[in-house]
Each structure stands twice: as C-alpha cells, then as structure tokens.
C-alpha cells in the first residue's frame, strides 16, 4: 500500500432533492421526495433531509413514503438535469486533480497525494457551494475505505479526517457491515460466526475465516486493520460485471449454492455502485460435471446460462440476490452435480442516464 496516498471521498448531500430545492425556492425547508408517484408502484429515488427525518429512505415504495410523511412534495425525476449538474461537479473536481474515480453521479474518490488534502477538501466544498449552490460532505483519509467512511460521519455539509491514529480508535467497535463490500448476505454470514465488529473479526481465527470466505477473508482482515491497498482508478466503462467459482469438489448442496449466489450478488452490487452503474439483466451460469465431446477444444463440461431482465435497472444487492436465487431455483438438475457456479449482470446504464420510463410514475 502506498504510504504517501491521500484520498478525498466527496458525497453530494441529497443530490437530486437538493437540486430541486435550489431551483425552486418554494421547496426549501420542505420534505421533498424525488421519485415515482405514490398513486402507482413508484419508488423513492432520493429525498431531502427534511423528509429523512420522517423515516423516508431511497428505494422505499412511494406509497410507504407518503404514509410516513403525508406533507411531502413528490417530484418526478429529471435525470437529464441531474446529469448536467453532475458534470459541473466533476468539472470543479478536475481543477484539483485529474485522478478521479466516480462511484455514482453524486460521489467520487479524488487522489490528492502531494497536496494538503484537508485544504483541498475545504476548497472543493467551497467552490461547489459558491458556484452551484449545493453542499457535499467530504471524507479525507490515507485510503479509499476510510475516506468513504469519513464522508458519512458528519452529513450534511461535513468534512471529516481519519488519520491512522484515529482509525485505530474507531475500527475496533465499527460494525462489520461498514466494511467495504460487506452486504446483507456477508453480514449475516459474519454474524453467524459471532463476528459483529472489526474487533471481533481481528480476534477470530484467520484460517477458519478463510474456510468460510476464501481469499475475501484476507481482504476483510486488512480493512479491519485500516489497510486498503486499492488505488484511485479513473472510471472505465464496463459491458458486464461477473463473478464465478470452479469448485475443487463437485457440489450437490442447493442451499449452499444459493447462499453463494447471494455472496456474489453482494460483490457485484458493490462494484456497480463503485462504477456508478445500474444493471437490468441478471444471469446465472452453471457448469455441470457432465463432459460433452466435440467442438474446437475436443469437448468441455456441459454448461447452461439462465437470465432474467428486470423491470427497472438496479445496483441493490438484495434485488440481484433474490433474482439470482429465483433463476437458480428453476434450474432442473436431473441428477447432475455442479462443477462451476457464476453470476453476472448485464445491460448496464450509468446513474443519471437511465431512461425515465424505468421509474414507474
């Protein structure tokens, strides 16, 4: 890991809703919900902090949001406008560094090594406020994981710094769900082992942890110690994202394989969010222990893929995992064993460039 790395994670505050409040003074101070209509099967895209005080959250059904906050003002998303503002934010970022890794339309990592990172974060926030009349929360640290963790500690309009010394104070009691890449399925698997905090994780036998999580165990251990070797990588567009595993012993345990798909879904959802992408198609790949002769390679193991297209693009781990399990449950085994299992997502779209028809209004 680089010892001279300094990273800023900038996360714009309630981005879509804040833009609407900025552009319409009558909405300022009111609970604003950007998303689908509560009169149909709409969902909340985002909401203002005034609405969040009533328990409204992103991805919540709009009807539930209306029940929690009857006085809320619902606004149809204008993704073209949000994307334009996102480009303005990115242009301001580029004044400070060219090494920018977008996570979504409203958040990004910036590599500001060799500069006064705290000063840069402060000036970046001030420029966005002065020119765009919006606020963002910044986290500053020596690695990406902790910079992202820091940006969420003083929202909205915060600036938090996590040094190595501060990390050693925070991490022992940090819930494992806060670790990079730990989604609902991984959190549940860790809890089943009695691991609830980073301190618990570091106290657990690493060899036993590897039996449950494979090479991912070592990544979790490093994160729990405050070590994240990943560099800030400028965005490169992907056509699909996937993960698969060839087993040393052919598998017949459907429940185990179903849980493995959930773990894959956690990882894919995290990667989608990292790249600011949503997926509309989920594909399960299975290679059986049945060898079929022929073809250019002289033969190969029998393989099938099964896909399902979603009504709306998603980067939610639970949704991807649920669809993957449903696909898997429909596969007929016919007495065969599983040699390889994979999960991938396709038909990727960038946040802010989604077709508005995807959102039920």
UniProtKB/Swiss-Prot annotation:
GO BP term (any one): DNA-templated DNA replication
DNA repair is among the record's keywords: yes
Manner of cofactor binding, per the entry note: Binds 2 magnesium ions per subunit.
One Pfam match: IMS_C
Required co-factors: Mg(2+)
Source organism, top-level taxon: Bacteria
GO terms for cellular component: cytosol
Chain sites annotated for binding Mg(2+): 11, 106
EC number: 2.7.7.7
Catalytic activity, as annotated: DNA(n) + a 2'-deoxyribonucleoside 5'-triphosphate = DNA(n+1) + diphosphate
PROSITE patterns: UMUC (PS50173)
GO molecular function, one term: magnesium ion binding
Compartments in which it is found: Cytoplasm
Keywords attached to this entry: Cytoplasm, DNA damage, DNA repair, DNA replication, DNA-binding, DNA-directed DNA polymerase, Magnesium, Metal-binding, Mutator protein, Nucleotidyltransferase, Transferase
Coiled coil: none
Active-site residues from the entry: 107
Residues marked Substrate discrimination (site): 16
Domain UmuC: 7-183
Major location category of this protein: cytoplasm
PANTHER family assigned: DNA POLYMERASE KAPPA, DNA REPAIR POLYMERASE UMUC / TRANSFERASE FAMILY MEMBER
Family: Belongs to the DNA polymerase type-Y family.
Subunit structure: Monomer.
NCBIfam families hit by this protein: PRK02406.1
Name of the protein in question: DNA polymerase IV
Species: Symbiobacterium thermophilum (strain DSM 24528 / JCM 14929 / IAM 14863 / T)
The encoding gene: dinB
């Amino acid at each position: 890991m680089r010892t001279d790395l300094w990273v800023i994670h900038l996360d714009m505050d309630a981005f879509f809703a804040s833009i609407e409040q900025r552009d319409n003074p009558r909405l300022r101070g009111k609970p604003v919900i950007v998303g689908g209509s509560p009169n149909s099967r709409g969902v909340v895209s985002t909401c203002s902090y005034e609405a969040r005080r009533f328990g409204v959250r992103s991805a919540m059904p709009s009807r539930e949001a209306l029940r929690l906050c009857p006085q809320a003002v619902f606004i149809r998303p204008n993704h073209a406008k949000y994307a334009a503002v996102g480009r303005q934010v990115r242009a301001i970022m580029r004044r400070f560094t060219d090494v920018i890794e977008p996570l979504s339309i409203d958040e990004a990592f910036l590599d500001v090594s060799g500069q006064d990172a705290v000063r840069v974060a402060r000036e970046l926030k001030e420029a966005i406020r002065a020119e765009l009349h919006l606020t963002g929360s910044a986290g500053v640290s020596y690695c990406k994981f902790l910079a992202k963790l820091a940006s969420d500690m003083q929202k909205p309009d915060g600036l938090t710094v996590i040094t190595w010394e501060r990390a050693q104070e925070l991490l022992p009691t940090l819930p494992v769900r806060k670790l990079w890449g730990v989604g609902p399925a991984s959190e549940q698997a860790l809890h089943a082992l009695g691991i609830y905090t980073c301190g618990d994780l570091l106290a657990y036998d690493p060899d036993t942890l590897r039996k449950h999580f494979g090479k991912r165990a070592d990544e979790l251990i490093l994160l729990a110690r405050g070590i994240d070797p990943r560099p800030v990588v400028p965005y490169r567009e992907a056509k699909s994202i996937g993960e698969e595993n060839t087993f040393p012993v052919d598998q017949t345990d459907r429940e185990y394989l179903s849980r493995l798909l959930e773990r894959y879904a956690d990882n894919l959802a995290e990667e989608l969010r990292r790249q600011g992408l949503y997926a509309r198609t989920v594909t399960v790949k299975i290679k059986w222990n049945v060898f079929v002769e022929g073809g250019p390679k002289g033969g190969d193991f029998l393989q099938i893929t099964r896909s399902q297209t979603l009504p709306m693009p998603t980067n939610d781990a639970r949704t991807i995992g649920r669809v993957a399990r449903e696909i898997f449950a429909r596969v007929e085994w016919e007495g065969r064993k599983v040699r390889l299992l994979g999960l991938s997502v396709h038909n990727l779209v960038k946040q802010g460039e989604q077709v508005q028809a995807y959102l039920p209004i």
